[in-house]
Regions:
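N-terminal strand-loop element at the rim of the active site
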Residues: 6-13, 19-20, 26-66, 181, ...
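A conserved mid-protein helix/loop that constitutes part of the nucleotide-sugar donor-binding site
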Residues: 17-22, 217, 226-241, 258-264
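Conserved acidic donor-binding segment of nucleotide-sugar-dependent glycosyltransferases
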Residues: 321, 331-333, 337-345, 353-359
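Membrane-proximal helix-turn-helix segments that form the acceptor-binding/catalytic region
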Residues: 140-174
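Short hydrophobic beta-strand element within catalytic cores of glycosyltransferases
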Residues: 316-320
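A short, well-ordered alpha-helix in the C-terminal region of glycosyltransferases
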Residues: 360-375, 384-387
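Short His-centered aromatic/hydrophobic patch
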Residues: 88-95, 120-123
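Aromatic "clamp/platform" in nucleotide-sugar-dependent glycosyltransferases that forms part
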Residues: 280, 299
Length: 393
């Protein structure tokens, strides 16, 4: 069977791109032919070193998405590679509008168009949950958005709904990352529940896990350094209340992004001890192997693989209940901790408790975390994708 992934830009750093590589490699491993089509020119990215050499990477020839050259090229890609299934990895309205037009033209001429799957990689309501953070700042646009917030909320709702409806129109199936997202996806896209299926992200189990029982007194954040949605300043402020009490512990912040300067300034101005900015990395497992706790303070997430990858290495996850899929990942008090959203004091208290546990108790939770992560072994996840392919073909 021949599979085509569509991404807006590939390669580039990001969770969607990383998961595309992981799934592509797993499909190739079990005999599928895989192509990845980038609609716009990508950037150099270390992730590419992990992509199986059998995966064919393609690009649209023209930067103008709707150009005749691009339309012809896309249909040629389908024909030459005998594509059976398209996996669309974005919710962009214009992209899906183009796909719907091409699908209509092909089917209108009595020809076969591949099965079309769109993957929703976030909480469908993320734009509403993060609205207040999105309109913070001193810029004129943000000031106007705050002044006209009720109107802006309606505008955002209409933009998001329009994108979901367009995705639903072009898709034979829509994939969300958790069963808890099915109803919200159906509400926004106005489609039947039967059209939506939940398949989680997965990870490869090939890497060796070392040092489970070592004394690893480190808290870890891995991800984009951007305040909108991620709210890393919240984690830094939480650490501010603990760093003097736990001088033998460190907070490692791994990643890069537009707000890294803000976070470094916050650490410096507040004189917060033992915070280390490690920059971006293509080997987060190095940091997982060093750490005891993996932290998130996001105001919304989709299905954060950073928690599951950390659990694989024996890191105990702690995060806010700001996304419904958290219950798929963490069993509170068993293999990690889930804190009510925006309850910073509870987050601080739970971290203090966790950092004070004896080695036996820590190892018990770490082992539980490892066992839970095994549910998301890519070998199990790819089986769910195979079932979906067979249903559509």
């Amino acid at each position: 069977m021949n599979i085509l992934f569509i991404l807006k830009q590939f390669p580039r750093y990001g969770g969607v791109e990383k998961m595309t590589i992981t799934l592509s490699n797993s499909l190739v491993k079990i005999g599928y032919n895989v192509c990845i089509l980038s609609l716009f020119k990508g950037n150099k990215c270390e992730y590419m070193s992990r992509l199986d050499s059998k995966v064919v990477c393609l690009n649209m020839p023209n930067e103008k998405l709707f150009s005749r050259e691009n339309r012809r090229h896309f249909l040629l890609v389908l024909q030459e590679n005998e594509i059976d299934v398209i996996i669309n990895q974005n919710m962009d309205y214009e992209v899906n509008k183009l796909m719907l037009k091409l699908k209509g033209n092909v089917q209108g001429n009595g020809k076969y168009f591949p099965a079309f799957i769109t993957v929703v990689h976030n909480d469908p309501f993320v734009d509403f949950k993060c609205l207040d953070t999105m309109i913070k700042g001193r810029g004129v646009k943000n000031v106007l958005k705050r002044m006209l917030k009720p109107i802006y909320q309606v505008y955002i709702h209409n933009v998001v709904r329009r994108s979901y409806i367009m995705a639903s129109l072009v898709s034979d199936k829509m994939v969300v990352l958790s069963k808890s997202y099915v109803s919200s996806c159906a509400e926004l896209s106005r489609c039947e529940y039967e059209k939506i299926i939940a398949i989680p992200n997965g990870f490869n189990v090939d890497d060796k896990v070392d040092g489970l029982f070592l004394n690893r007194k480190k808290l870890l954040y891995v991800g984009r350094l951007v305040e909108t949605q991620k709210k890393i300043s919240e984690l830094i402020n939480i650490w501010k209340y603990l760093c003097e009490e736990f001088l033998d512990w460190d907070l490692l912040i791994v990643g890069d992004g537009p707000d890294v300067g803000i976070y470094k300034s916050l650490v410096k101005s507040e004189n917060i001890k033992n915070v280390y900015f490690e920059g971006s990395t293509n080997s987060p497992e190095y940091y997982f192997n060093q750490s005891t706790v993996v932290c998130l303070t996001s105001e919304s997430e989709g299905f954060p693989m950073v928690l599951i990858e950390g659990m694989k290495y024996g890191c105990i996850p702690i995060c806010y209940d700001s996304f419904s899929a958290v219950d798929d990942i963490i069993d509170d008090g068993v293999n990690g901790y889930v804190i009510p959203f925006n309850k910073q004091n509870e987050y601080i208290c739970k971290l203090r408790y966790l950092m004070s546990l004896d080695d036996t108790s820590l190892c018990y939770m770490r082992n539980n975390a490892i066992k839970k992560s095994e549910l998301y072994d890519m070998n199990k996840v790819v089986f769910e994708w195979e079932k979906l392919f067979n249903e559509l073909i």
